[in-house]
Regions:
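Aromatic- and charge-enriched surface segment that lines or borders ligand/interaction sites
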Residues: 111-155, 302
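Ligand-site clamp/hinge motif
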Residues: 206, 235-279
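Gly/Pro-rich hinge or "lid" segments in bacterial periplasmic/extracellular proteins
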Residues: 186, 191-242, 246
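Extracytoplasmic/peripheral linker and loop segments enriched in polar/acidic and small residues
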Residues: 114, 407-410, 414-415, 446-513, ...
């Protein structure tokens, strides 16, 4: 999903991180350690309209504190992590859901599906389901929701992110059956449809909605802008009723504040904690499928020279960054997707730092007239992940070892998206953008279509050969698909080098002793409230 943009792609018990291999005596590691110490700080819990607590402590309200207020609750934007964490599978539901642990597709509002021709799929919808406004759910609503998200002029995040510009043809053939036809064979269409939340066919197609109606276990009760969002249990829900009668979200930008709210009993769940604020008693780690990377704008000198891009890749000490700043929440990466995603390449390994060879590449580029002294702006987002500012400073320091002139620009989410998504800003010079990509869908096609193509929404450039390889891999299935996408990631590293991969990440969820919940790789994008129970209901 957007972790920032899910453009993440979204959508278990968390395995322990492998032991970190610390490097002693390296200049980057020493600087990282010093930087980390400089940025530690103490915070107190901010006041709220309930005296600091998220809701009625000890009552039947589940209290959640987020790292930011959702920009919208529009269902067709639910692949944005900040929206999906509230809406997805809570207020609205898709036809099909992907099990975040096994990767299997499971029936939700669709009970069965089948491919009837190379380009057509048929879906049977679940009978006896009603929307929160009392309207009966039928296949017409499902067809409408797909058409609204993919074929309308709403510019939904799912359109172009999950589906390409060719659109789909969708038709309800009865009250309980619909067909979806694509322009070309699509072996993962059911997976793509798991990103589309179903809404009533009375929903506006002219404008995005602020407070949607869905079929989920909770309905929106109240959104007090800047203060809180309250969800009320949907007593007509077709599935198992959730344990809590209501849920209340507030948001605090400082991770130390969110952690303190758990410790002080003011919240039950808290997203995106910082390792320095986490303890065994207030948090749990989980694999979140996120990968941090530096995207280099290959349109602007000196980053338009592959030697400079390769030099940056070679000088970055990923192990030092992971050990010193990420702790057990980061593992050095060599590609944009983690293990478990279709297309992950087992043969790729993180680049071993080689400052001498990297400096030689920059020197050769300079000798050929490349303006290697031109200022590069390293753009990162406040709150993007724990210790993001220190990470940006570490990258700046290491790039400076090459003689590159790097300036850091820390932004808010809105400004960061302007650098991340097309149309890209003009007249801003060469940009090195710190990104965090999460492939929750479990298939490399979602990553490649967003980040690797020449015209991808989140790429700055590409090559015809890489475009060709991605197109060929997308049409395949099974082992052929796995092999082809693994080769795509290898080719990106060897011949394009748009990305300097940093680390595969883990998340930290604040969890109070009053509730029971097992986070999984989708938790940061769709925190399913129905999976949370009071402590006395289930042993931890």
């Amino acid at each position: 999903m957007l972790s920032s943009v899910r453009p993440s792609v979204r959508p278990s018990a968390c395995p322990s991180a492998p032991p970190a291999r610390r490097r002693r005596g390296t200049a980057p590691a020493a600087v990282l350690a010093a930087t980390a110490l400089l940025f530690t700080s103490a915070c107190t819990v901010a006041n709220s309209d309930t005296g600091g607590a998220v809701g009625a402590a000890g009552g039947n309200t589940l209290r959640i504190v987020l790292d930011q207020e959702p920009p919208t609750l529009e269902p067709c934007e639910s692949s944005l992590a900040s929206t999906g964490v509230v809406v997805r599978s809570n207020v609205t539901e898709p036809l099909i859901e992907r099990d975040p642990t096994s990767g299997e597709l499971r029936p939700l509002l669709a009970t069965a599906w089948r491919q009837t021709t190379p380009t057509t799929w048929s879906f049977d919808t679940r009978p006896g389901v009603t929307f929160q406004n009392g309207r009966k759910f039928t296949a017409k609503d499902a067809a409408f929701s797909i058409d609204r998200a993919v074929n309308s002029d709403l510019s939904c995040n799912v359109d172009g992110y999950v589906f390409d510009d060719s659109g789909v043809e969708v038709r309800a053939t009865s009250a309980t059956r619909l067909t979806v036809t694509t322009a070309k064979p699509d072996p993962i269409l059911p997976l793509r449809l798991s990103f589309i939340e179903i809404v009533p066919r009375t929903t506006s197609t002219e404008a995005k909605v602020r407070e949607p109606v869905g079929t989920g276990p909770y309905a929106i009760g109240n959104w007090q802008t800047g203060v809180s969002i309250t969800l009320d249990r949907n007593d007509t829900y077709w599935g198992k009723a959730p344990a809590f009668a209501r849920a209340r979200y507030v948001w605090r930008s400082e991770p130390s504040v969110r952690a303190a709210m758990i410790t002080k009993g003011e919240a039950d769940l808290a997203t995106a904690l910082d390792p320095k604020d986490a303890t065994e008693g207030n948090s749990v780690a989980y694999p979140n499928n996120e990968t941090t990377a530096l995207r280099l704008d290959g349109r602007e000198a000196p980053l338009d020279d592959i030697r400079v891009r390769e030099a940056i890749d070679m000088v970055i000490d990923r192990q030092a960054i992971s050990d010193t700043l990420f702790g057990e929440l980061g593992e050095p990466a060599a590609q944009l997707v983690p293990k478990g995603v279709v297309g992950f390449n087992d043969d790729l390994t993180p680049t071993t730092p080689d400052s001498e060879a990297a400096r030689a590449l920059v020197k050769a580029a300079a000798a050929d007239g490349v303006p290697v002294d031109r200022r590069i702006t390293l753009v990162a987002r406040n709150g993007q992940f724990p210790r993001v500012a220190e990470t940006a400073e570490a990258l700046q320091y290491q790039m400076a070892q090459l003689g590159l002139n790097v300036k850091i620009l820390m932004t808010d989410t809105a400004a960061h998206l302007q650098y991340q998504l097309r149309p890209l800003p003009e007249n801003v010079g060469p940009i090195a953008l710190l990104i965090m990509h999460g492939n929750q869908a479990g298939d490399a096609a979602f990553t490649a279509s967003q980040y690797l193509l020449s015209k991808s929404p989140q790429s700055t450039f590409g090559t015809r050969e890489l475009d060709r390889r991605v197109a060929a891999a997308t049409a395949l299935a099974g082992e052929q698909r796995q092999k082809a996408f693994a080769e795509v990631f290898a080719y990106q590293n060897e011949a394009v080098a748009q990305y300097v991969h940093l680390a595969h990440m883990r998340g930290l969820l604040g969890l109070s002793s009053s509730v029971r919940y097992e986070p999984n790789s989708a938790t940061g994008d769709e925190l399913r409230l129905a999976a949370v129970t009071p402590a006395e209901e289930k042993g931890r």
